[in-house]
Amino acid sequence: MLWQCLEQAVTERLIPYNPANGCRLPKKEKKKMQIIPPEKIRDYLKAAEEWGVLPMFYLELSTGLRRGELVALLWSDLNLQTKTLTVSKSVSRGKGELVVTEPKTENSIREIYLSDEAIRLLVEDRKNHPFSPYMFPSPKTGGMYGPDCVGRIHKKLLEKAGIEEHVRFHDLRHTFSTLAIQSGIDPKTVAEILGHASAEFSLDVYAAI
């Protein structure tokens, strides 16, 4: 847009030449992806178990769900017969209240196959709150966790597990991607699990490991 305006100014003889000619934007440096070091994942999950949130964070590390998707899960989203989890909504905080919305893209609406261990943990945890519609109800309110609250718990788990790396909650998606690709799952499948339109993100992960 700026280049075109300057070209027009040259045409109208307002300036002698276009100063933007030959200018190149600096290459955008890709941020190095942070993940939980594989050798520390056991410590992280142990911390989650001691904190009483193992099912939630085990599911996160085995699916790479977005934070809002994780806290929006209902028990009706889990199909025990097909061992699948339907991801069709997300939670965000707006004007101090939790708001449930549909995903922004069609690719974000998806079914994910769960491992037997993930299902076992979820079913066992269900016994603690059998009448709640939420998969992970807040022990304080009985309602949904706020996404920010889950982020704070994640930080506590890192501290308890002695993980010094600066790993954001969102980086758990990178952790899942890394582990999935290293285990032989193709980037396209990983992208589908994550709810991405293409495998580009997964390929970036592959290039970084």
Mark where each language-model region is.
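C-terminal catalytic core of tyrosine-transesterase DNA break-rejoin enzymes
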Residues: T11, L54, Y58, S62-E69, ...
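Catalytic-site neighborhood detector that most strongly recognizes the C-terminal catalytic loop/helix
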Residues: K27, I35, V91, L194-I209
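Active-site/catalytic core of tyrosine-dependent DNA strand-transfer enzymes
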Residues: E39, T82, S90-R93, S115-E164
